Design a protein with these regions (language model features):
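Bacterial N-terminal signal peptides
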Residues: 7-15
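N-terminal phosphate-binding or glycine-rich loops at protein starts, especially the Walker A/P-loop
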Residues: 26-72
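Short internal beta-strands
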Residues: 75-82, 163
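Glycine-rich, charge-decorated loop segments at or immediately adjacent to ligand/cofactor-binding or catalytic sites
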Residues: 86-91, 161-183
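Glycine-rich oxoanion-binding loops at beta->alpha junctions
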Residues: 94-125, 137
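Glycine/threonine-rich flexible loop motifs
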Residues: 134-146
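Conserved anion/nucleotide-ligand pocket segment
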Residues: 183-253
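Conserved functional hotspot residues or short segments at active or partner-binding sites
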Residues: 270, 275-324
């Protein structure tokens, strides 16, 4: 009951996180990974590792396959939260394995240990490529995995090349800056909740501000991208952000993750609805029942009928213009 009350209070206190509707489409944007002329020379004659997942694509081809086909000496794949294939639950332990197509070892940073690479793994490569699609939230963990790898690369004298991608929530900044006494695995830098930065910008800022150890860092930027560019993701960044609408709603909806309310995990509308069994039927006509699904094996309130609010029909343009 106390958590349900907290949810109600948060609903009243939550500021409207409205963004100026970005102009332009994503058609003209070229992601860093596609600019091979900018980074292939940095890989020549060197052992290469990648920090990558299912979003690391160049057109219809995965970055790992592109590197392998191009004769790059690929010696390791490091995988972040949700695993290399992006199917694991939030925070789920994922065992290391081998990429079937290339035979390259996949070293999971979420294997239940330190979430950092081993000394053995660090000795297996000379340069690290980072290519993952972020969504622009402080508690979204891909940038934290990148920072941990950057620190290890600084310790071992390894070069880091970040292949940048647009931030789909990059047109605005909102929320408080993290008090670093609360630094954790879901918040690693003194930045706002909605920080507006790309992965490459985070990497540069972290080194420049002294938040990360100095390392040999190169960022390959996106072409024809600004923070006013509306960019629709071609691949879901994680199992419970399957649509562009869920990505736009995530900054507001995820704030209630610590309450008793279901946020749609275990439904076909994750982060596009919310509810609880005790929400009154006379005020909340929408009902749903969380069930085990890929990426949500044991969702909150599993098997219980919840009443709440359905946001799955809310137009993306309205979310961008007015917030939630």
């Amino acid at each position: 009951m106390r958590k349900l009350l907290l949810f109600s209070l948060l609903c009243m206190l939550l500021p409207v996180a409205a963004a100026a509707a970005p102009e332009g489409a994503c058609d003209g944007v070229t992601v860093g990974a596609a600019d091979t002329a900018a980074y292939f020379p940095l890989l020549r004659g060197r052992r290469v590792a990648v920090l990558a997942n299912q979003t690391s694509r160049v057109g219809d081809e995965h970055l790992v396959d592109l590197l392998h086909r191009s004769g790059v000496r690929l010696t390791a794949i490091f995988s972040p939260e949700h695993g290399f294939r992006g199917t694991a639950d939030a925070g789920e332990h994922v065992a290391s394995s081998v990429d079937e197509r290339t035979g390259v070892p996949i070293r999971s940073l979420y294997d239940g240990r330190t979430r950092r690479p081993s000394d053995e793994a660090m000795r297996s490569f000379d340069v690290l490529l980072v290519d993952m699609q972020d969504v622009g939230l402080r508690f979204y963990t891909y940038y934290i995995s990148m920072l941990r790898m950057m620190d290890s690369c600084a310790d071992f004298g390894r070069a880091v090349v970040v292949l940048d991608r647009p931030n789909p929530n990059g047109s605005y900044i909102d929320g408080p800056v993290l008090d670093m006494k609360y630094k954790s695995g879901v918040g690693a830098l003194p930045i706002p909740v909605v920080h507006g930065l790309t992965m490459g910008e985070i990497a540069r800022m972290a080194v420049g501000e002294g938040w990360a150890k100095p390392c040999d860092l190169t960022v390959v930027p996106c072409r024809r991208y600004t923070h006013a560019t509306r960019y629709e993701l071609p691949v879901a960044p994680s199992p419970n952000l399957p649509t562009q609408r869920s990505i736009y709603l995530y900054p507001s909806i995820c704030l209630f993750e610590g309450t008793v309310v279901s946020l749609g995990r275990g439904t076909d509308r994750p982060f596009e609805c919310y509810g609880h069994p005790d929400m009154p039927a006379d005020r909340y006509g929408f009902v749903f029942t969380p069930r085990p699904t890929a990426g949500a094996k044991h969702p909150p309130l599993e098997g219980r009928l919840c009443r709440g609010v359905d946001l799955s029909e809310k137009p993306c343009e309205e979310i961008l213009a007015e917030g939630l």
